[in-house]
Amino acid sequence: MSVTRTKTHNDVVVTLGLKNILVGTLAGRDEKRKIHQGSKAINLTLAKMAQHVGPDLTVLDGTEGMQGNDPVDGFAIDSRVTLASAHNIAADVIGLQVMGYRLDHVGYLRYAMELRRLTLDDIEVIGERIEDVKIDFKPHDNIASHLTWSVEGDWRPVFDAVAD
């Protein structure tokens, strides 16, 4: 189970349920530092880890989110939205949309969707419409560098080279 606040992140645009549990499973500070090796590397590594580890239930507590230069210098946002799903990727994809971001902003989720052959049409939202609860979270000041996650051309050989 992964329970986390909706928040922006200094390397991967947002931290939601999947990243919360993936990084939380790493043993120590050194292991966590190893995956933070630039935008391309961290997004490929998180997608690779997501093939092996993932919560059975994700709860995104957005009653009060965190925006801006999180995790060190972020500030609260009163978003008053809570999301839950038994499908970890679906929860995060809807969560990032509620925060005002698109799937192509968050590499590890985009890769995870492609690996599982999922599309946005495969995700059913029950309850409020995204448009009715969406609140734009202020991104990290360095968001331009975070959006360089995409590997040119076919990313799968690079993905396959990432150690399990």
Model region roles, listed by residue range:
Residues 2-164:
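Extended, low-polarity segments enriched in aliphatic/aromatic residues
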